[in-house]
Amino acid sequence: YVVPWNSPKIANILPQLECQCKNCKEPLLLFGRFTEMTEHVQKLFRYRNFITVSSNSWWDYLYAKERFLTLEGRQLNGKRNFNKRFNKAYPNAEFIPLNPSTIPMARAFLEKWYKSRGDMDEGLIAERDAINLAFEHWDDFELIGGILKEGDSVFGFTYGSGVYEDIFAVHIEKADRNIVGAYPALAVALAKMLPEKYK
């Protein structure tokens, strides 16, 4: 899990995550900025044993929000072109906030998305369970996200949370692979929605 360390609710969230993992007979794995996360875990689990590991195979990309607002530069050329194609094909598409009242729409899309994938392996089942846990505790986890849609057609959804003062982590992006440019459109729309404190 990637958890919002600066949340005042973190002390309540971690035991719930640990319980969920025990029920699944899996260890509780936390991902984040190595030094900061280690300090927080040491404070919250003062009398517990834990192992910290830093592996570059688990590292994520870090982008300035401005890059996703504009998609400028050679590295983002492909995303920019796909985003333009999406906007041309779906000029009335909108990105609405994910919240407890719109989560049912995202859940319905998610079920279709998994059905389109065919057989569910352990990884997809764990991912689906994590997304559903996030939906159930949306406000507790202080998540921010949205649904990309046009009329009654949902093209995808995305969400994440702040993991440091000015850093926002995207936890999930799910889009219809048959809709050209849906993934870049989600990324741009989320970047536009983020509070100014995230850079």
Question: Where in this protein do the model-derived segments appear?
Answer:
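A structural signal for short, well-ordered beta-strand segments and their strand-loop junctions
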Residues: 27-33, 62, 94-98, 147
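Short, glycine/charge-rich beta-strand/loop segments that flank catalytic centers
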Residues: 26-45, 56-59
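Acyltransferase donor/substrate-recognition loop-hinge adjacent to the catalytic core
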Residues: 46-119
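Conserved acyl-CoA
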Residues: 14-25, 185-198
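Short glycine/threonine-rich catalytic loop with a Thr-x-Gly-x-Asp
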Residues: 179-183
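Conserved beta-hairpin
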Residues: 135-136, 142-156
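Active-site rim helix/loop that mediates acceptor-substrate recognition in acyltransferases
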Residues: 123-142
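Conserved donor-binding loop and adjoining core beta-sheet/short helix segment
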Residues: 1-36, 149-178
